[in-house]
Amino acid sequence: NIMISRSRDGEIIAKVCEKWGFKVVRGSKGKKGSAEATLQMINELKHDNYGAIMVDGPHGPAKVCKDGVVKIAKLSGKPIVPVFWYSPNPTFLKFPTWDKFRIPFFSTHLINLYGEPIYVDKNNTDEQDEQVRLKVEKALEELEKQAPQRYKEVFRFGIWKKKK
């Protein structure tokens, strides 16, 4: 399950994700659309389905984690697992969006980096939830810093070499 905006840009991304076999949960900035998508995502997580959310939301700013991901984790009882994918390869489909969203094109080599799970106590205060939100941001920043070096390490192992 991937939560994606109901915007025009989101429609393109949703179609790609569905073609790749992902279930898409659509939400909009308005309270009703956002609440419906949030409740649907919480329900999916409570039924042990996976969920993915771009933590900077549909309108940014880029790399600033919104509080919605913390609320979803808190209400579902599931941890937040920071994920960052990286490739220096320029062959990406680039979208003219505020966050410069990119989708890998054809045989792009990329790596996924995963951070430690971040748990949210259901009894947290608003201040504690804010600390969790900041922790998510910091974890993603750290993965982004590590990505170029980790990519080089993976590439050195020859994982993507063509078999003869």
Regions found by a protein language model. Name each.
Residues 5-7, 56, 85-88:
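Cofactor-binding loop segments of dinucleotide-utilizing enzymes, especially the Rossmann-like FAD-
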